[in-house]
Design a protein with these regions (language model features):
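Membrane-embedded alpha-helical bundles of multi-pass transporters/translocases
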Residues: 2-482
Length: 482
């Protein structure tokens, strides 16, 4: 099969593509609560010391270095009539939903408990359970993006659908919490932050997991798999032979610092500008353009390779973020100046974020094809376990660093509230301005270093797709003849 025919033959319809996206939308309600609000929830709402949170996240990071690759190899060894990925997606939504409710209900369940040790124990146990089941669901889900079709365009559309729809559904978490903070401080509502997070946990654990279950119920695996069950040792060997995948992983790790801004954005609007809900106003243009950005990703893929798109996106973000920082450096406490600036910044930031939500995931699918071409074995589970691991690792590192930075930049925890003492020696408001704009974006340029050695693109990648397509045809013909 020539490369043109391979690209033109489509296997996945619009309905299945949309359902795959809706499933991811359900999954990320709980994930975004953890990724964006973990420090705020555990330190400010639950009342757990930041040092304990940082230590737990560090230990969980060590656990993930073993847990994720092991889960990936288990997935790659799975052979059932439902495929090797879908069985996990059929099973995991129920236990993951229960774990989500238990974790975010902790502050409410232990409302009258004074023992910090008891809170820490509850936090560690429930977070471990949540991480465990999240891994069981996340690795097969993203592995499915490479197995849903042999056509790279189908895969790109499935990933784009997942990122687009999850951005809409999961993106509601931040604004809901920002509005609630302002309503609570003004005395307009009668529930507190503990109850809010419990309610959000229930929504994520029931409605969110109901949507996530659609991934196992309504999708198909279409890429032909070797019927022989590989050894766990072989899966690990393939992982370390996959140079393009390891380069993508290194890039993601180096880009960890970019996520720090997520934690401090809430504090910036609350303490520097005086109103948390201003983040919603500032975020409106970016939200719109972020969704629109998904529509022109196919056009970018026609013009540039995936590697070229990523390099350009990271550089643009660094340049724009630096310009915004210096333009607003004299007025960083003036909402009338900063909110419009953050609107402009949000437009560029959201476009770059949309691109980075799709392209690297698609590139991991390319590395799975590369290893099939090189070894005749497909390792979606092992390969995408690294995506899950790195996603959690970078999130955990960012959260741990953020928790450690809170006292360093002058913020203090007083009972259940985060406060900013006036007349301190540290200009906390200015540091928050730098942390949400220039610092993460500039340091993120380090993530481009591994791409200098990445060569799985252009004619090389086209030849690989051509050769494995021919191999699959031969396997199909042989099976039919038998």
């Amino acid at each position: 099969m020539d490369n043109t025919a391979l690209k033109e033959k489509r296997y996945v319809g619009v309905k299945e593509t949309v359902i795959y996206g809706i499933a991811n939308g359900g999954q990320v309600i709980g994930y975004n609560l953890v990724r964006m609000q973990l420090t705020f929830f555990l330190v400010t709402v639950f009342g757990i010391p930041g040092t304990a949170v940082s230590l737990m996240i560090f230990i969980m990071g060590i656990w993930d270095t073993m847990n994720d690759p092991i889960m990936g190899t288990i997935v790659d060894k799975t052979r059932t009539r439902y495929g090797k990925l879908r069985p996990y997606l059929l099973f995991v939504p129920i236990p993951l939903g229960i774990a989500t409710i238990l974790f975010f209900g902790g502050a409410e369940f232990l409302r009258d408990v004074q023992s910090t040790a008891a809170k820490i124990v509850y936090m560690c146990i429930t977070y471990f359970i949540w991480e465990f089941f999240y891994t069981i669901g996340d690795i097969p889900f993203w592995g499915l993006s490479a197995a849903i079709s042999p056509n790279p365009q189908d895969r790109s559309m499935a990933i784009t659908s997942a990122r687009f729809i999850s951005g809409i559904i999961g993106g509601l978490v931040g604004p809901v919490i920002s509005v609630f903070i302002d309503l609570q401080k003004s005395g307009k509502i009668g529930i507190d932050m503990r109850q809010l997070f419990f309610i959000l946990g229930i929504v994520a654990g029931t409605f969110g997991m109901a949507l996530f279950s659609l991934a196992g119920i309504c999708t198909k695996e279409r890429v032909i798999q070797n019927s022989e069950e590989p050894k766990i040792s072989d899966c690990f060997k393939c992982l370390f032979k996959n140079k393009p995948l390891l380069l993508i992983v290194c890039s993601n790790v180096l880009g960890t610092v970019e996520s720090i801004a997520d934690t401090f954005t809430q504090y910036f609007y609350l303490f520097t500008l005086g109103k948390a809900s201003l983040s919603i106003i500032a975020g409106i243009p970016g939200t719109i353009t972020g969704f629109l950005a998904y529509t022109f990703i196919p056009a970018l893929e026609k013009k540039w390779s995936s590697k070229q798109i990523i390099i350009r996106a990271v550089i643009v973000k660094a340049v724009v973020s630096s310009a915004i920082f210096f333009i607003g450096i004299k007025w960083y406490r003036q909402p009338t100046v900063i909110v419009p600036l953050m609107m402009v910044w949000g437009v560029f930031n959201s476009v770059v974020s949309s691109i980075k939500m799709v392209i690297p995931t698609k590139m991991i699918g390319d590395t799975v094809d590369y290893m099939e071409w090189k070894t005749k074995e497909r390792n979606e589970g092992t390969s995408f376990s690294l995506l899950t691991f790195v996603s959690k690792l970078t999130g955990s590192l960012a959260t741990a660093v953020s928790a450690a930075l809170i006292p360093v930049i002058g913020l203090q925890q007083v009972n259940q509230d985060m406060v900013l003492p006036e007349n301190g020696e540290i200009n906390t408001r200015f540091l928050l301005w730098a942390i949400v704009t220039i610092i993460p974006a500039v340091l993120n340029l380090l993530s481009l270093i591994p791409y200098a050695f990445y060569d799985l693109e252009g004619e090389k990648l086209d030849n690989i797709h051509r050769e494995i397509a021919a191999r699959r045809e031969e396997i199909t013909k042989s099976a039919s003849a038998e």
